[in-house]
Amino acid sequence: MFDETQEKIMNAAMELIMEKGYGSATTREIAVRAGVNECTLFRKFAGKKDIVLSAMTMPAWNPQLKESDFRWTGDLTEDLTNFSRVYMQKVTPRMVQVSIGLQSPELFEETAPGILQIPMTCKNVLREYFAKMGEKGIIRSRDYEGMAVQFLAMNFGFVFFKASFGNRLTATEQEDYIRGSVERFVDGIG
């Protein structure tokens, strides 16, 4: 789909956006980081916005999370643990940094649907799962939407903190966080 030069340009652009934000990353800096002439950049792409929108289609810059990524066994703890693992495997601190960098007013209208697709997929998957577990009498609450958003926020929060602060806020390892948070969540809804 993209040639090697285009990929270098897209990767350079996204790295700069993570570091500086969309508005502060210039096409000149992108070209230098990619190791190409700025004229080459404009032969390959219409401009910075085109580079970003193209990069958002690449697996390196889009977690491409789908409903089929999640497998359910019917065991609340096991299922939510697996959900968290898949979520954190795909929605990495790097992806969060890119999402933050792309929330620029001049780009937001074009990038928001792609960025929103990931949490919407997760929320819908969780809501449907909680509804099934509610029908089976495994969970008490019937606020499936609320539970889905809370569980998603718990996972996103951890990834966001790691993206923003590394281990400076908490040295808790991902797997320890998943086990502990799932255990507390299940205790609260079970």
PLM features: residue spans?
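Helix-loop "lid/cap" segments that line or gate small-molecule binding pockets
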Residues: 84-91, 98-107, 185
